[in-house]
Structure formats: C-alpha cells, structure tokens
C-alpha cells in the first residue's frame, strides 16, 4: 500500500505543477500544453486509489492496528485528487467549444432542451424518451429544416472523418455499481467520460468543416456509423454513471459533495458534445446541399 500511496502523491504533485503551468498559459492567452499528461496522471491516481480503498477495507476487517490511520491518509489523498479533477475540468473544458464560433449560442437552446431533464432523452438512435416519444422520428423531422439553419463551421484542417469510437471501460473500473464505501468507482467513471468527451470534441473541431471539404460522402458515412453504432452505447454509459451517482447521494454517502460536482461536470460536457454533434449534422447537410447546387447530377451519398 505504501508504494501505491507514494505514487498517488507523486501524481498529485505532478498534476498540480502542470495545472499551474497551463493556468498561467491560459491567463497569457497561450496554448495549453499539458492536458494529456495531466489527464493520464489523474487517471493513474484514481486507479491506485481504488485499489488502496479496497486494501484498507480488507485491513480494517482484519483489525489491523494501523487501519484507521491509513484510511484517513487515503481519504486525504482522495480529496486532493478530487479537487484536482475539478480544477482539470475548469481549466480544460472551456477549450471544447470556443466562444468565438458561437456554437453554444446558436444551438444551446435546442440541445439543452434535450438534456435538461437529466440526460434521459437521446437525440438519436430512434428509441423513446420521456413520454414514449420517438426521437428517431423527431430527428428525421428536424432534417427537413436543416437547409434553413445557419451553418456552423468548426475550423481547422485535420483528419476528415468522425473520431474513432471511444473504447469501452474495462472490468472493475469505470462504470461500477455505486455501493456504500465505493465512491471511487463512480468518480473514476465520470473522470474517464469527461476526458473521453473532451478528446472527441477536440478531434471533431480539428476536422475540415469548410464548404469545400475534400470528401463529404466519406465524412457522412463515418458520421452515420457513429450515430447508429456508437452514440447510443455512449449515452447509456453516461446515464449509468448518473444513476450510480444518484444512488450514492440517496444513501447519503460521505463523498456526496465530490460525486455531485463530478455529475454536474459530466452533464454539462455531455450537453456540449451533443451540441457539437448537431453542428456536424447541420454543416454536413449544408455541404451536401451546396454540392447538389454545383453538380445537380451528382449525389453526396
């Protein structure tokens, strides 16, 4: 346990240093340089903390004389990691949707209505939300209005296709059931999803979304594949994390404060991601309409 605790301490100190450096970069309007390393350190710390909590629980059951003192030390480490997770979100999440693009302003109201009730109403996937509404039918109806919507054009040249699907969590880690004495699983799950969503949005924003994109048909295929095969499972993971968090809050777990903070951060990041997906859908439709005007005999599909 001592070796793991020492590594967590090192991760905390390294994370603190990187956060301070990027905070200074942000104040000076410079690029943030340490997001990936900071996320990796926090992820490692949370995995180690999970094992430490299990070990100290075993020591307590065996009535080890230092179990209580060790548990206090681990709880202090956990509080520090949780605080750094909150600082990570506050520092890096603002990079996801740059205000200068106006994405949130143009689309926030419509997408916000989809997620305000607690992420229970999927935008796509054709299954019922609140009241049994067919969201797939709604999405098709919205498609008829796309040519009249203003184009949102995330800038930058990069890979043209939709991001690769995020890998599913491995056993025992990310989306674990929330039971008394096991807050780390839910917190780790939220942190993992926050990191994954931020990475997805970063990659989307780096794609070529100009009206003259090289391969709109290929981009459309990748995007439709994501909607049909990946979006629903990702939404289910987010919903499961929300259920786990609610369960622990209802059980009045001592870590209710950090749990609620992580839940709110995840809810906001998921809404941002849906907003950006709507931007993709809108811009793809505009590019396809533009191609049909230029070449009436061709089809983007």
Curated annotation (Swiss-Prot):
One of its GO terms (biological process) is intermediate filament cytoskeleton organization. Keywords: Coiled coil. Residues 18-41, 118-166 are annotated as: Disordered. It holds the Pfam family Spectrin_1st_PEPL. The keyword Repressor does not apply. Residues 136-151 have a biased composition (Basic and acidic residues). Residues 26-41 have a biased composition (Polar residues). It comes from the Eukaryota. InterPro entries: Plakin, Spectrin_PEPL/EVPL. Residues 1-88 form a coiled coil. The keyword Coiled coil applies. Belongs to the plakin or cytolinker family. This is Envoplakin-like protein. It comes from Homo sapiens (Human).
